[in-house]
C-alpha cells in the first residue's frame, strides 16, 4: 500500500507538473516569473493549480506514508513544473526585475511553509524523531518556538551551497544546487536539534535564498538582461522562484531521510 501510493504520487506529480506548465507557456516556453508573465491569466491559473496539486499530494501521501515523503512528493510536482519553466534569461526578457524575482521567491517560500505546516498538522510528526507536543502545528504557534527557528538557521548552508554550485543558467544545475543545499541544511538542522520536528525547516532554505536575492536585487536595477548576457549576475539571482520551492521541499525530505539514526540527543530544557 505504501509503495503503491508513492508510485501513484510520482505519476501524478509528473503529469500535474507537465499539464500545469503547458498553461503558463508562451512562444518562448513556460514563463518562470508570473507577475511579469506575457501569458496573463493562464499563468496565474497554472501556478495556483500546481500548488493546489502539490498540497493534496503532501496531505495524501503524508497520511498514507509519512510527512517527509508527502512533502517530497509535493516538491517533485513543483520540480517538474520548474524543469519545464524558463531560466533567468527568459525572465529578464519577459520584463522581470531582480526585485520581482526575489519577491516571488519569498512568496513561494511562504507557500512552502504553509504546505509544510498543514501537512504536519494533518499527517502528524516524523515517526523516527522524538516529539515535543508543544512544537507541533496543532498547538497554536508551537511550530515557531525558538527550537524550530534555531533549526531553521541551518538553511544558511543552502545559501553557501547555491553560491558555489549555481554557476550557469541550467535548470538542472539550479534545482540540483538548491536540493543539495537543502539536504545539507536538513542534516545540519537534525544534528543540532535532533528532538525538533522540522516544520519550519522544510521552507527555510527557499526563504533564506529569497531574502538574499532581495538584498542582492537592490543594486541590480530594474532591468538586468545586459548583466545576464555579460555573465555578471550573482549565482543566487539565477535561481527562479519555483526552483527554490521544489528544491527546498525535496532536499529537506532527503536530508532527514538520510539521517534517520543521526543527531545528538538534546536536553528537554528548551
Pin down the residues of each PLM region.
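C-terminal transmembrane helix-loop-helix hairpin of multi-pass membrane proteins
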Residues: 96-104, 188-270
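Hydrophobic cores of alpha-helical transmembrane segments in multi-pass inner/ER membrane proteins
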Residues: 46-57, 104-126, 182-183, 243-259
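N-terminal signal-anchor module of multipass membrane proteins
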Residues: 1-54, 250, 269
Amino acid at each position: 500500500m505504501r509503495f503503491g501510493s508513492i508510485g501513484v504520487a510520482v505519476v501524478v506529480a509528473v503529469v500535474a507538473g507537465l499539464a500545469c506548465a503547458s498553461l503558463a507557456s508562451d512562444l518562448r516556453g513556460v514563463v518562470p516569473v508570473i507577475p511579469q508573465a506575457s501569458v496573463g491569466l493562464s499563468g496565474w491559473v497554472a501556478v495556483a493549480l500546481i500548488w493546489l496539486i502539490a498540497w493534496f499530494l503532501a496531505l495524501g501521501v503524508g497520511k498514507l506514508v509519512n510527512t517527509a515523503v508527502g512533502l517530497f512528493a509535493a516538491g517533485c510536482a513543483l520540480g517538474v513544473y520548474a524543469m519545464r519553466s524558463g531560466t533567468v534569461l527568459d525572465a529578464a526578457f519577459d520584463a522581470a526585475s531582480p526585485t520581482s524575482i526575489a519577491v516571488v521567491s519569498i512568496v513561494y517560500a511562504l507557500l512552502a511553509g504553509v504546505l509544510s505546516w498543514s501537512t504536519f498538522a494533518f499527517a502528524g510528526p516524523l515517526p523516527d524523531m522524538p516529539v515535543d507536543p508543544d512544537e507541533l502545528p496543532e498547538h497554536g504557534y508551537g511550530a515557531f518556538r525558538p527550537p524550530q527557528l534555531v533549526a531553521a538557521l541551518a538553511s544558511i548552508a543552502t545559501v553557501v551551497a547555491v553560491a558555489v554550485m549555481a554557476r550557469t543558467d541550467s535548470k538542472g544545475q539550479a534545482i540540483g544546487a538548491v536540493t543539495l543545499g537543502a539536504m545539507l541544511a536538513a542534516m545540519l538542522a537534525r544534528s543540532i536539534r535532533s528532538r525538533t520536528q522540522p516544520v519550519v525547516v522544510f521552507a527555510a532554505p527557499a526563504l533564506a535564498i529569497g531574502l538574499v536575492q532581495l538584498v542582492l536585487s537592490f543594486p541590480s536595477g530594474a532591468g538586468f538582461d545586459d548583466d545576464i548576457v555579460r555573465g555578471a549576475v550573482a549565482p543566487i539571482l539565477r535561481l527562479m522562484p519555483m526552483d527554490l520551492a521544489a528544491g527546498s521541499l525535496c532536499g529537506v525530505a532527503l536530508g532527514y531521510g538520510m539521517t534517520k539514526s543521526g543527531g545528538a540527543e538534546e536536553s528537554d530544557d528548551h
